Amino acid sequence: MPASSRKYPYVGFEPEREAGKDILFVEGITKTVDGVKVLDNVSFIANKGDKIALVGENEAGQTALFKILTGEMEPDAGSFKWGVSTSQSYFPQDNSAFFEGFDEDLICWLRQYSEDTTETYLRGFLGRMLFSGDEVYKPAKVLSGGEKVRCMLSRMMMTHANVLLLDQPTNHLDLESIQTLADGLARFPGNLLFSSHDHQFIDEIANRIIELPLGQPGCLDRTGTYEEFLEWKHNR
């Protein structure tokens, strides 16, 4: 049988430096969005090595928390503090702002986020996400949803951050790409905070689960797998 010629993406996140013991402190964060209190006195401490999945139906609360932790949004109350040795890279659920109005090609798009601006270097990261040959000269503004996600992952890999924040990263990805992303995040030696509705994706990566229940203060926080979290929640 001939070998398959199909190519698969490669996702590998390599931190430039290891984070210290202190990762993230969240204290009493509260936020109302469009008249709905989506975060109510949320507190937790992220420890070194934590790969935290944000789960549940409160997607607006999850996105608000990501935006607060990355400085895009101010909390109504509460505070947070990143450890001094941490560096963060963020994958937003809505990436349109990264591409709207950008008339140049993918090489130029990625060059905005890189200290090394050589085409060979940038091609390497785009190539991991299956942009090869003349595809790297495609205008960034005409990309499909899946292609934009692949570009955002190329950008994240290039940052060499030791803390990754990903808000619904599996949207627009096919099954092979989702599995490749799961493998890359499972291998990642740093800290993760991510949201997903994909149970298998969560199970392959997370070692801690946090749910932000809508209409209730605080959060449900449990170390372990998603299955263990669901069993614990059921028996509370």
What does each model-identified segment do?
Residues M1-I23:
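Coiled-coil termination/hinge junctions
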Residues E16-R236:
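ABC ATP-binding cassette signature C-motif
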